[in-house]
């Protein structure tokens, strides 16, 4: 099931968001209008971790992204394959992480290098899961990160299926920085920054000098 962003927000969240203040505009997301997902070249899962089931606790959030080409002559783009969040204790989160990794056959699991991410990193690595601890550039607060990934959206390189989980991600991003939650936003910015640093997503503005080559992809 799917609903347009504003309608979904008003009906299910009772919190319609003004588009004017958004860093990431709703219409910058490209709709994937097919029932089946595209064939993807590379899959990354991005985590924002918090270990508590208390109602007042932060959420843990997971988003899964795939690199693909919408057409044969288009540049590499990414598509949101899935996202979810919840208040899970550590054993629950570990189980969910293993299940999601196995289901999507993920190439990389990305966990921010902060205190709450360390135990999950250690446990998943013991299971043989390829975890990378990600440390955003110093001084990059959440708002700066959102601005840094906005050009990728504006260039039409980010797709989402017409599903309720995608609407939740789109709405949270459109609500930032004034929305109630930003856990999914954190997983999104982390993933796109890593894709950019790894050479998976290249913008025309990256190459002011024509002599510059395309960055080599980094698969770890």
Where does each model-flagged region fall?
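ATPase catalytic-site recognition across NTP-hydrolyzing enzymes
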Residues: 1-49
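Mg2+-dependent endonuclease catalytic cores in nucleic-acid-processing enzymes, primarily RNase H-like
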Residues: 15-19, 23, 61-63, 68-176, ...
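Acidic two-metal-ion nuclease catalytic site recognized across multiple nuclease folds
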Residues: 21, 191-220
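An active-site-proximal beta-strand-loop segment
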Residues: 47-60
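Generic detector of well-ordered alpha-helical packing
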Residues: 49, 113, 183-184
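Glycine/Thr-rich phosphate-binding loops that ligate phosphate moieties of nucleotide
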Residues: 166, 170, 190, 200
